[in-house]
Structure formats: structure tokens, C-alpha cells
């Protein structure tokens, strides 16, 4: 099956493509089924499997929609079941039988109504009350199950035949006409024992397998699949167990296998999509586990009420019949029995697989085969189904992690390609390393630009590439590109001339006639071969068999490459946009000046707002009703709010500087706190960890304070960890009650059912998963009354039924926690989210503990919920909001910082070009001034660590420079604003100033003087003046070192800078009210201090001035003693 589409974003287009592919595939499935049926009716010798698969995919011979619909109906509504059990369908209200399998009378020991008998009570037929066929105790169990919100969650239930007292597993589900009851005989005492403890007990059968899955290291999907097939084989005992993965183009591959040593291996084989028809895939989502006990056993017909308009759906039945083509396939591969389990993961494109499955997709199947008849009891199948849910969770995490790693690789490659474009556009992306072939997986690539062609890897010739471009321009005039896994199917006339080395192509249109291409060869060379490739006879391809399926797959992909994935097309589309942008002309100089000014404005404004957010956060932390503390990298306290002070009895001045571990932590928690600190300082933040702190003063007699803490690494703007902040919740009262409860063990009623506010929400279940405890706090939290909750199943009926969960994964994780507690593995502080009766989301921490009787036997589970106080929730909400504001501003600054780099590079290129031309002295000075201004701007852009400036840790870049160069740059930065205000700008320097060279940080000095000058210009009345005067005095120090003590005066008339602005400059004002100008002046003052200088702002009569005093080492040792 081919996929060709115009280049666009992957979201909606991907969904539409996948839907179209599935519709096309369903038609191919129907054609193949029709061919088999025609062959069977004529004796069966004319059916060639490989050729039929290839023919079914021929788009020139479409099947009528009516025929496809009829095929799908047969797949879901075939009126046959397997013979290992029997089936009845009844009306839910009356229990009147409306359909039954013909073997019911034999299995239940009753007489068909068609046989004359005097005992009509033990006869079965349409209209019979099913309750008359079961024992009285069985009837009550069935009636209770039918009353449940979801009958399937009660499976299995034990029922006895009234006539023979034979025991059956009854598996119930609803379909479109009524209640379907599948009856499977319980053949041994072990089967009965497995049932006696209910569904929860059956899940315990998978406890070891689940524990092993959860203990595996991340990042290895193949290893995960290997383990799951091993564990399924141990649970079920089948000869062969395989993990079968569906690829994006719907074909399948065996990715893991464990088998009997004498069986032929199938690991690595690929299969065409028709091997698992779309209708079967739907059924695998509807009924996630499918067992065939004996494919050679005769099928049993289903008799149904003539008033039912069509054949009854058996999609949800455990005994759905086996179609002839599948029977033949199994027999050809030497298999008699099979067990197939579906594996679902999250679907980001949200194509629903069926009711209740929105957002899930079928990743693949776990397939088991056995050479002799084999029946697996329902409890073991239920355990396997639960194992598949856990496997799906683990697999989903691995798939998402792999996707993240892939996206990061693509982003890194895009960044490198962008850098190459700046140096050598556009040829750099094909002539340097890495190149465009590193962006996505491909065999070759080509760039067609300006009539020239650059080729990489295995690609068409230059003439062929130009011909493809001509075809795209003429045949796809309204698109920006094309992606296809088959140029033949896409309609390129000369596709077959390219051979098997070029089958698939992704093309990105850059301009009207310029393109970037990626090419892929045929998919066959990507296939991992397994077993003998040519050991079979010529006729093997005609028989339905895994090897012939593989041969059919190779035939299907002969002129086709692997499909282009959505993430790859997104990467190509992004590079296409970047390339288009790189061809645009650089904006004119005036626009660049505007951008530079906007950059500086945004830079300072962002600093101001971030500073304001930080100050607000400090105030919030200090006044929060939740205990919050912070430590530096040495583990010493540098933050301690009023709430933690109240709980411990230790005031803020008393605690500052003390060691959290040595001085404040209770001995029982020292190891925990040390580990918590170590991990947080290394960037690994732990949540919901219990610690105990010592108490002092009036609190000392109450014992240690018990806190549930989240550790957050504190970072500076360069992402360096500078400490740890602990946001906590006081759980001392809850813990005392919980400990007391645990000690009592027996008579707990007075505690659990108390209305005391210190009692946390508590609920419990028996060993079968039914609710046996639901305390008042749980009633208040959930909105569900105790009398309504007691007796209901915790999973699916309470949680997942009345109380909705966020998704299917949430229910699976909850079931894992409950089953772990039943196996004596308690869980502490597990994050748990559900919706209460009114639909409000509830986020809690779940702690489980096993319930034991007086003999120590586990009889159920107790669950404790820890809820955050309203004050803490409010504090966290405010914190998240503040963090979002800070993050938005930081991103905006990062964007501006990134976007300004390109025009800066353009300026740099223009200046570098001009430097190599013949220039006058004045022109050389202008070029030099431009270079110093550019250098200053780049340094400001790189300023990410404002905290280092604040604390005096910034590292200066010292070098030799000319003072005259600095002054020229400073004056040039003030010229435009001075001219706009009609100001006279003077620069007063001594005669020998041009020859003065010193050591220091030229860019930082430039930055400071320019900022002082521009502030003076801003606060000078129109038509006034501004003067910058330099007075250097050279001194010779012992040791022959000469220094220049330099006074810089930036003077201006008028009222001068406002007092509040001066207060901001000298940090005498509240940081939250700092203006843009105040923040800039404050940073400049701190930069001066870093250079061991001093700065003042003075008022003398009608003159105001900044006075900057610096001592700078001279570059020459033999300068004159004075230049004044």
C-alpha cells in the first residue's frame, strides 16, 4: 500500500492519511477474502496466497463498497462459535433467551424444545427464561452482576447448571441486542480455586511478570518485548510466543519471540497488512484477548430469534468462531491452538479505536501458538490481559521517550544546518557536515538551486533530479512539496527508470524553481532476515503460511520505500521555512537600528518584570501557610518562612546558616534528607518524600514535625543549580492517626469512621476487590455516600465508573497499586487523580496497606488519601502562575536574542567586506566604531547571568584597548537621540588622549558610559547640551607598573535625573518598582564596582553629572608621568 501526500504539517493531514489508508486496506482485505471463498467453493486448489495479496492491493481494480460492507459484517456477525463452551443471549430485563448455541443443551444437560418431553422446565429454546437453567445461588449472582453499571467488570462469575450441577465460568457482556453469557466449563479444581478469590486474585497471577517489567531499565523497547513474551509463555505454556508490531503503513513485524527449540523461527519476519485485516484489528480492540482452543474442531452454529433483523454481533464473545482462511493458515504453520492479546498505546492523532478507546491505538499483538489443542482458563487469560495493560503503559513511556530523543536529534541537526546557512547559504547544508541527510533517515539527497544540482548519497543523476523538479512544477503547481513512498504510485512517468535504489521521495519547494530532495531505496533492504531465505519450494508462496506472507510482503514493497513519518515531515517542513527565510534580503540599516533599540528595550523590560516576579515570589514564600524552606549548595539554610518557624519553634534569625541535616533534621530522617539534597543538587527532583524535623521551645514536647516535601532545585539564569527549595505539607496529625490505626489492627471502627478533621480519607477493599470501607472524610472528598460505595468494585465501578479517572492508564496504574498491596507490597504517596461526583478534579497522594486478619492472612487492602491543604493549593497556584509569567518573558527575550543574531551577522559581513577595501582615515574610524558597537551588542545579547553581576561574580574580559576608540563608540551611540532633541553633544579629551592605551574590559566600559550618556540626553531639556569629559592622570607604581586614574564626567543642564531613579540606581528602592531605566543604571553601577571603580551622580547649581572614577593599567610602561 502506497502513501503519497503533499507536504504540510503532520497533525490533521496525518490523521486523514491514516484513515484513508485503513479504508483502502479494508477494501484489500475484502478482495482477498472473496478470492479465498471463490477458491474454496471450487475445491481450494486455485488459491495462490502471494499473488492474491498482491492483486488485492491493485488500485485499478477497486471492490464495490457494498461488498466491503458485507465482508465486514461477516467478520463481526458470523453465526458460529467454538466448541469449547456454549453461549446464550438474553433480554436484560426478562432474562428471556433470544439466541443460543446449538451445544447448550449438551453442556447444561437440558433438552432442546424441538425434542418432545414432559419436562418443559428443563427445555431450552427461544423465549426460555435462562434462570430456569441455573441453580438458585447462580441466579442471584447473575442478577447482581446484571445490575452493575458495567457487567463485564464482574467477570468471571461461577454458575452451576441446575440439571447436572456442573460448574462453569460465566463471562458476561452487552451487545447490540442484549446480554451475552459465554459459559466455559471449569475442568479442574485448580481452575475453581483460582476463581474463588475473584478478579483481583487472578491479577495476582501476573504479579511476578509485572514486577519484572517495572524493574527493567528504560530505553530498550526490544528488551521490554523480550521479557513480556518470556513471561506470557511462563503463564500460559504455549509452544511459541511472539510480539508482533504494526508499522505506520499497517504491515506487521515479529520483534520478539520465544519458542520450542525444534520450531522454525519467525523473529524478524515482516508480513503484509492483509495478514491481520482491519476488521480483525477492530475486534482486537473490542475484545482484547482472543483464544482459539482447537482450530480443527467443528464450529457450533448459533440459533437466534427470527425477530432480530440481522445476525447477532459476536465481537465481544470469548468464543467467537474461526474463519476458514485463518484455520487453513494455522494448520499450514503446524498450529492447532492460539492465544492473541492486543497491545494498545496512546495515539497522539486520536483516531479512536472504538467506544471508550479514544486516544488509543493498536501498537501490536502478543501472539501465542501451540501444536496441540490448548485451553487457558479465564483467570489466567484475565491475568494476561492485565499484564498487557501494564506492558502497554511501559511501552507507551518507551515510545514517547524514543520520540523525544529523535526530536532532540532533529532539533540539534536543524540548529547546525541553520549555522551553516549563515556562513554559506544555501550550499552549506549539502557541502558541509552534518548535512541534510543527517536530518531524516534517507539513502540520498539533492539540492537544486539556481539551475545547479548538488547530490548526496544514493540519488538520481543531475538530469533525473531536474526532470523530477519539472514534473513537480507541472503536476503539483499548488503545493510546496510532495512526500511519497512510491514514485511509481505517485505518478512520476520515469519512476521505473530510477530502479530500486530510488523508490520513495520527500521534496521541499524553496522557491518557484528551487527544491530540496530526500530519497529512499526499496523497503526490502531494510528488512531484517530471519531463518532460511530460500529453503522452501516454488509452491510455498501459494500456501497461506508465515513464509509465504513474508514473500507476499516483499512483493508488495518491491517498488516502495519505508514511509515518511510525521516527525520527519515536520523536520523537513521546518527546514523548508528556514531556507525560504535565508533567501530574503537583509533589512535596511534603519530597520536594523529599530530592531536593536527594541532588543535593548525588551532586554531591560524583561529583566524588570523578572525581578518583580522574583520579589513577589519571595513575599509569597514568606507569608505562605504551607511550610517552605531553602538551603544553599552546602546544605545550610538560607530560606525559612513563618509557617515552618511556627511548626518547629525556631525563628528565622536563629535558623539562618544552620545545617539542615546536622542541626535540624530528626535522626530518623537524616539519611533520607541527605539523599534528597544530593539528588536535587544534581538536578534530580524528588516529590512526596516524608521527612521529620526536630522541634524547639514550646513545640519541643510535641515530638518531631512530620512533613511531606517536594524538593525543587534552585537555578540561576544560566541553569546552574545554586540551592534547593523544599515546599512541604504538614502531615504530623495524619501520620499520628495512621500509625495509631496501624497499631490497633483489629478494632479500627471508632477511628476510621470518626468525623474528626484530622482523619484522612480512607477506603478499603476485600480480597476480591469489593469496597468494604468508605469513611466520612472519603464521603466529603468524593461526594459518594458510604452506603452507595460499600459492596461495589473499587476498580471500574467506583473509580472508573461513578468517580471518573483521567484516562485508561490511570485505571491500570490504580489496579497495579491495589494488586501490589494484596501481595504485601505497600505503596507510599502514589499520585492519584480522579473526578468527584460533581465533576471537580481531585489530586491526592495514595498510600496502600494490606489488611490482615488475626492469623496474619491478607484479607484486603486499606487506602489512605493525602490531600493538600487549600492554602498550599492556593500557594502552588500562585507559584505556577508566576513561573508561567517568568517563562513567557524569558522565552520572549530568548526569541529576540536569537532573531537579532542574523542581522548582526549581516552587519559583520558588510563591515568585514568594507575593511578589505581602500578607505580614508575617517572611514577607517567609522568602521572601527561600528565594530566596537557590534561587539558591545553581542556581549549584551550573551548576558544570561544577571545574578553574577548582582553578586559581583561576573568574569570580566580584560584586554588592551585604546581609550579614543571607546569614546568614539560612546559618542556615536548618543548622536541620534541628541540630534532628535536638538542637543549639542561635546566630547572634551586631552591632546594626547588618542595615544592612551590601557588594559581592561573595553565592552563593559563602553556599555556603562553609553548608558550614562543616554540617560543624560533623556533628562536634558530640548536645545540644551550634554558633555562627556575625560581627565586621565598617569601614575607610576613600585615595580615599574604605570596606571591611569581616569575621571569620566557626563554633564548636562536642567533638573537632572529624578530622585527615585537615583534611588533605583543605588538600590535604595524596592526592587519590585524598578523602572527600565533604573534597572539599567543599577546594572551599570554594579559593572563599575566589578571594575574596581566608583560612580556618583552629583548636582552642582544648574549642572548635573555622572562621575565615574576608574584605575586602569597602562599598556606601555614608559608613558609620561602625567597627561593632564
UniProtKB/Swiss-Prot annotation:
Ranges of residues in domain PAC: 687-743
Description of post-translational modifications: Contains one covalently linked phytochromobilin chromophore.
Record keywords, A-Z: Chromophore, Photoreceptor protein, Receptor, Repeat, Sensory transduction, Transcription, Transcription regulation
UniProt cross-references to PROSITE patterns, sorted A to Z: HIS_KIN (PS50109), PAC (PS50113), PAS (PS50112), PHYTOCHROME_1 (PS00245), PHYTOCHROME_2 (PS50046)
N-terminal signal peptide: none
GO biological process: detection of visible light; red, far-red light phototransduction; regulation of DNA-templated transcription
Domain Histidine kinase, residue spans: 895-1116
Residues at which phytochromobilin binds: 325
Boundaries of every PAS domain copy: 613-684, 747-818
UniProt xrefs under InterPro entries: GAF (IPR003018), GAF-like_dom_sf (IPR029016), HATPase_C_sf (IPR036890), His_kinase_dom (IPR005467), HisK_dim/P_dom (IPR003661), PAS (IPR000014), PAS-assoc_C (IPR000700), PAS-like_dom_sf (IPR035965)
Keyword match Transcription regulation: yes
Subunit structure: Homodimer.
Role, per record: Regulatory photoreceptor which exists in two forms that are reversibly interconvertible by light: the Pr form that absorbs maximally in the red region of the spectrum and the Pfr form that absorbs maximally in the far-red region. Photoconversion of Pr to Pfr induces an array of morphogenic responses, whereas reconversion of Pfr to Pr cancels the induction of those responses. Pfr controls the expression of a number of nuclear genes including those encoding the small subunit of ribulose-bisphosphate carboxylase, chlorophyll A/B binding protein, protochlorophyllide reductase, rRNA, etc.
Name this polypeptide is given: Phytochrome
Source organism per UniProt: Mougeotia scalaris (Green alga)
Annotated gene: PHY
